[in-house]
A protein has these predicted regions:
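Transition-metal
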Residues: 1-133
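A short, charged helix-loop
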Residues: 135-139
Length: 152
């Protein structure tokens, strides 16, 4: 195959989402609270569809299963990437994700090893990574007593 695959992908509304995907990047969005654009996805909650060429109309998960040669003959049982573009217009929740081994064993799907590339950010934007507590119990207790919100 000598041409790239262009994908029709899925938008996900989030309480913390915004309009930047439309206003700054030109995407058509279904509401003013779009938080995630799953640009490349074979995840059951939002599978990309091929838009062009001989595979037009085919779902990415099916294409991966039936034409592994297009993906370098990868050995993972399911397509191994989920590429998202986020619009975080408000605070995000604390995130804890399993690795692939734990995810497959306990949740039936791959884990979520992450890599971030910040495209744009407001001047007062923060990323909080890690913590200074000496025990997990103290860290979790401190988080629960501070700004805990079931909606973040």
């Amino acid at each position: 195959m000598s041409e790239p695959l262009f994908l029709q992908s899925v938008m996900h509304e989030k309480l913390w989402g915004g309009r930047k995907l439309r206003d700054e990047f030109g995407y058509e969005i279904p509401s003013d609270k779009v938080g995630e654009y799953w640009a490349i996805s074979a995840h059951p909650n939002g599978v990309s569809t091929v838009k062009n060429g001989r595979f037009a109309g085919q779902k990415l998960d099916t294409l991966y299963a039936e034409h592994r040669e297009l993906f370098g003959n990868r050995s993972e049982p399911v397509f191994p990437l989920l590429t998202k573009i986020l619009d975080a217009d408000d605070w995000l929740s604390v995130q804890v994700h399993p690795d692939d081994a734990y995810g497959l064993k306990h949740e039936g799907e791959l884990g979520k090893t992450e890599c971030w590339y910040i495209i744009a950010a407001d001047e007062d934007t923060e990323i909080i990574y890690g913590h200074a507590e000496r025990s997990e119990e103290r860290r979790v207790g401190k988080e629960c007593r501070s700004r805990w919100s079931p909606y973040h």
